[in-house]
Each structure stands twice: as C-alpha cells, then as structure tokens.
Swiss-Prot record:
This is Paramyosin. Paramyosin is a major structural component of many thick filaments isolated from invertebrate muscles. It comes from Dirofilaria immitis (Canine heartworm). It is found in: Cytoplasm, Myofibril. Keywords: Coiled coil, Cytoplasm, Disulfide bond, Motor protein, Muscle protein, Myosin, Thick filament. The keyword RNA-binding does not apply. Belongs to the paramyosin family. Homodimer. Residues 1-9, 834-848 are annotated as: Nonhelical region. One of its GO terms (cellular component) is myofibril.
Amino acid sequence: AFGSMSVADLGSLTRLEDKIRLLQEDLESERELRNRIERERADLSVQLIALTDRLEDAEGTTDSQIESNRKREAELQKLRKLLEESQLENEDAMNVLRKKHQDACLDYAEQIEQLQKKNSKIDRERQRLQHEVIELTATIDQLQKDKHLAEKAAERFEAQTIELSNKVEDLNRHVNDLAQQRQRLQAENNDLLKEIHDQKVQLDNLQHVKYQLAQQLEEARRRLEDAERERSQLQAQLHQVQLELDSVRTALDEESAARAEAEHKLALANTEITQWKSKFDAEVALHHEEVEDLRKKMLQKQAEYEEQIEIMLQKISQLEKAKSRLQSEVEVLIVDLEKAQNTIAILERAKEQLEKTVNELKVRIDELTVELEAAQREARAALAELQKMKNLYEKAIEQKEALARENKKLQDDLHEAKEALADANRKLHELDLENARLAGEIRELQTALKESEAARRDAENRAQRALAELQQLRIEMERRLQEKEEEMEALRKNMQFEIDRLTAALADAEARMKAEISRLKKKYQAEIAELEMTVDNLNRANIEAQKTIKKQSEQLKILQASLEDTQRQLQQTLDQYALAQRKVSALSAELEECKVALDNAIRARKQAEIDLEEANARITDLVSINNNLTAIKNKLETELSTAQADLDEATKELHAADERANRALADAARAVEQLHEEQEHSMKIDALRKSLEEQVKQLQVQIQEAEAAALLGGKRVIAKLETRIRDLETALDEETRRHKETQGALRKKDRRIKEVQMQVDEEHKMFVMAQDTADRLLEKLNIQKWQLGEAESLTMANLQRVRRYQRELEDAEGRADQAESSLHLIRAKHRSSVVTGKNASASKIYVL
C-alpha cells in the first residue's frame, strides 16, 4: 500500500510537472507566434514601403498607371485599414489571449494550488495511509507470526494431544490395571488387616504373656534367689549334717568299738560271771532275777537304741536322697531358669521387634491416612477444576457460536462486497472503454489538428509565395485567395463547428466523467470505508479470535498443567503404590517374622505352661514333701517323746539300777567293777543320747526351717499364682475390650475403604469425562483454528482486493487527470489554431 501510494504521488507530481511544462510550451509557442506575427508585420511594412516607393517611381507613368495607382492606393488604404483592423483585431486577440492566458494562468495557479492542497492532503493521507499501512503490515506480520506460532502451537498441541491421548489410553489401561491391582490389594489389605488384627491380638497376648513371663521371671528370680539362699542354707546344713554324720559315724564306730569291747568285756564278764557264778551263786541267787531283768532291759534298750540308730541312719539316707533330689531339682530349676531367661530374652527381643513393627505399622497407617486425605483433597480440587473447565467449555461454545454468527455476517458482507466489486469492475471496464473511445477521438482530433496545422502551414507558404509573386499573379492570387478564403472560411467554420462540438462533447464527457468519477470515487470511498470497517471488524474479530485462541491456549495450558498434575499425581500414586507394594512385601516379610516369632512365642508359652505345670507339680511335690516332712516331724516328735519317756524311764531305771548296784556292790564286791563299767557304758550312752538329742534338735530346727521355707515358698507361689490369675483375668478383660474395639475399628476401616473405593470409582469416571471433554475441546480448537485460518485468508483476500481497488481508483484518477490535461492541451491548441487562423486571414486580406 505504501509503495502504491508513493507511486500515485509520483504520478500526480509528474502529471503536474507535465501540465506545467505543457503550459510553458504553450506560452513559448504563443510568444513565438507573437514574434512571428511581428516579423510578418515588419515584413509587410517593408513591402508596403517598397510598394509606395515603386508607386512613387511609377507616378510619372501613364494615367492608367495613375488610376491604377489610385486604385492601388485605395487598395492600399483598404489594406492599411484592413491592416489596422487586423492589428486592432490582433491586439484585441492578443489582449483576449493575454486575458485568456492570465485566466488560464490563474486557473492553472488555482489548479496548482488545489493540486498542492490535494498534494498536501494526499501527502497527509499518504502519511496516514503509510502509518496505517505500516501498522497493517506490522499487524499482518504479527498476525502471520501469530498464525505461524499458532500453527506451530497447534501442531505442537496436536502432537501433544496425540501423545496425551496415547498417554491417556496408557493411563486408562494402567488405571484399569491399577483398579484390578487395587481390588487385589484391597483383598490382600483386608487379609492383612485381619492378619494385623490377629497379630495385634497375638501381640497383646504376647505382651500380656511377656508381662506374665516378666512377673514369672521376677518370681523365678526371687525363687531362684530364695532357692539359692535355701541351697546355701541347705549346703550349710548339708555340711553340718555331713559333719554330724561324720561325728555320728565316728560315734557309731566308737560305739561299735565300745560295743565290741562291751561284748568282749561282757564275754569276759560272762566268763567271770560263770567263774564267779559258782562262787557267788548264793549271793547272786538273790539278785539273779533283778540282774536278768536289768540285762533284759539293757538288751531291750540296746536293741531299741540300735533300732533308733538304724531309723536315724535311714532318715539320714532319706535326707541324703532328699538332698540329692533337691540338688538335682535345683540344677533342673537352674537349667529351667536359664532356659526361661533365654526365652524371656528372646521374647523381649520379639517384643521389641513387634513394638517396632507396630510403631512402623502405626506410622504407615498414619502416612496412608495422610495420603488418602491428600488424594481426597486432590480429587476435590480436580472436581473443582473440572467444574471450571465445564464453565470455560460452555463459554467457549458461546464464543464459538458468536464467532460463527460473526463469520456468517462477514461472509454476507464479503459476498455483498464481492458483488459491489464486480459492479465496480464492470463500471471501471465501461469507463476504460469510454476512455479508450475518447482517447481515439482525441487522437483523431489531434490528427485532424495536425492536418489543419499542416494545411495552415502550406497556406502560409503559399501566401508567402503569393506575396512574392504578387505582381505577376495578382488576379490568379485574388481568385485563389478568394477560393482559399472560402475554403479557409469553410474549413474554419467546419473546424470551429467540429471544435465546438468536440468541446461540447468533451465538456459533456468531462462532466459525465467527473460526475461518474466523483460518484465512483464516493462509491469507492464508501466501499473502501465499508471495507475498512469490515477489515476493522475482521481485525477486531481476528483480535478477539486471537484472544479466544490465547484464552483457549491458556485453557489448554491449564488443562495441560492439570493433566501434568494428574499425571504427576498418578505417578505419585504409582510410586505410592510401588511403595505400598514394597511396604506390603516388607509387612508380609515382617508378618512372616511375626508369625515365626508368634510361633516361637506360642512354643515358649507352651513350654512356659509345661514349666508352670512342672513347677506346679514340683510345688505339689514340695507340698507333699512338706506334708511328709510334717508327718515325719510329728512322727519324730512322737518318737522323740517316746524316746524321752524311755530315756526318763531308763534314767529312773538307771537310778534304781544304781541303787540296786550300790546295794549289790555293797552286797557283792565283784559286781562293783561290772557295775562301774556298766556305769561308764551308761555314761557313754548318755553322751551318745545327748549328742543324738542335739542332732534331733538340730534336725528339728532344720525341719522347722525347711517347713517354714516350704510354707513361705508355698505361700509366695500361691500368692504369685493368685496375682497371676488376677492379672490373667484383667488381661483377658482388657483383651476382650481391645478385641471389641479392634472389631469396631475394623468395621470403620471397612466402611472407610468402601467409601474410598467409591470415591476412586467416581474419580475414575470424572477422569474419563474430563478426558472426553479434553478431546471435544481439542476438536473444537482444531475447528476454530481452521475457521481462523479461513478468516485470515478471507482478510488477506479482502486486503488484496482493497489494494487492487485502490490501485484501480488511482489509475482511474490518473487517467482522468490525463484526460483533463489532454483536454486542456486540445483547448490550448484550439485557441492557438484559432489565433493563427485569424492572423493568416488578416495577412491574406492585407496581401489582397
């Protein structure tokens, strides 16, 4: 457009320069014509002076010559008058020409001013149009860039949509796989929850068992300490018993030696008695029965003492057996205690591992709840974003309908503009034909004028030759001049008539052309204004479409961002799913470990129960032993009381025997020594009795201590068992309460899982709907891109048509200006031809 306007301005300037140059040429031609007329006038004056001289020279001729001279003078007077008239006419014509020239100059000056104004206006219009053209070119370049960018973006978006559709298909398949895996994981999760619940129950049981085992361990430790103390006491007692046993054995050895000695002495005494029997039969006869009684009693007492010694030896062997059995039991208890300590350490480690697993499971449950809440929030945000996208989609549909209406309106306007352009083209074609016809007529007139000028020149040449041959060919010249005058008059009249007709036709054509040009100019200006309005509307529509495209691109970016967010969320969910799988595998491994630990704990519990049963059996054995010991104690007490009674009786009898012995010693001197020996033997027996009494007392003390220890151990065991029973009852109540709470929590978790499953299904449906809406939006975006491309092509076509109309209008204006300039040239030439014709006629008249 800028190039076309600059070319139009240059064309108008060149046309103005051509007009000025033509006016200067016309002025120069008129000056030359005036100089030529003055020269011809000077030549005619010289010829007139020469003719007057010749007439003066010929005055002396004949009268005919005088008359001819008179006639010639009269003719000369006429010629002078004609010359003066022609001069006056020439002066009038010159004045008229000057006036016309001045008027023409003024007209040309006015036209130049108008043209300058038009030029300045055209310059301003040109500058404005240049600015508009620059802006339009910038906008067109921007539109082309935007179009190129939009095409690239559209291609990129198409590629992205294809990729996204592929990704969405993959995601759908993956979502289906995830749904299946989720269902499978849900079932596994339910199983794991059940197993976790069972593990929790077992863990609580194990904790309770651990607590009980800890209590049992404490009790076992206390019992072990008590057993160790008892063991140390028993060892001390055993050492004392061994010492006593050694002393008793030494005493028994001494007693056996004494018995052997006593038997030997008894044998000696028997021999002595048999020896002295004969001597003292009379003396002993009195005391024989008493001695027999005493011997029998002594034998009985000896037998009883031997029986008591055997009983004590049996008791000592039983005590040794009990000691060995207690030692073996203590060793077994130590081994069991070590086993219990090992099992307790294992159970403590298992408890710590289970506590760690429970804490990890709690942390994982908290993480899963947090992730579930985050997923719910993201789902709610996705629903809100989907609602926004629905609203934007509805707005885009409304904008699409508005654009469709505007496109339809623009298509109607373009159709009308096309029809108007077709009419304008048809009229321009007609004007071109009319201009061509007028140009042909102008060329014909120019040829006719050239022919007339050539004829005028020929006439002037002939007139000059006639003036040269005036004297010889006067009559012929008069006749020819008359003919020429008639021909010139007829030609002048014809030319004047033709010129008037042509000027009228030219004026009519000029008026029609100006009216048509003004009408076409107005029409074209109106059409250009309408087209500019349509272009502005199209630009606005294009800008709005660009805005809508930008909005839709932003929406697509938002959708792409949301899709990327959903992809990231899906990737996060996949990562979380993989983490959950790993966690599930770890939990399954930990569950297996927990199962193994639980089996170990169950086995340890069974072993502890077996140990408890064994401990109970041992307690019952100890109780039975205690009962046996109490029975033995009672029996020993009765035996001790009987032995004490026997000892009292023996002491009484011994006193009686002493008395009797004293009496017998008093009666028999030989019996004194025997009695003295018997007395010593009785003293030894008393010492043995005292030692046995001390041993019995020590055994009673030991039995009482053992009984007290057994009673204390039994009471402690019973108290511990009662506390354990109470603890087991409280633990059972707590476990039942926890079981109920865990069942309620499991029911809540099941409901929550069902709700989450429903939410996931709804989110999947919403995702499918969002994908469908995204596909529809992409299709609509492609349609709008195609419509935008068509609108841009239509705008480019309209701009090209407007530029073509502007060029055609400028060409029409140029042709109109050329026609005006050619018309002015024809008028100027017509004026110059008229003036030259008048001058030629005047010169011819002067020659005649």
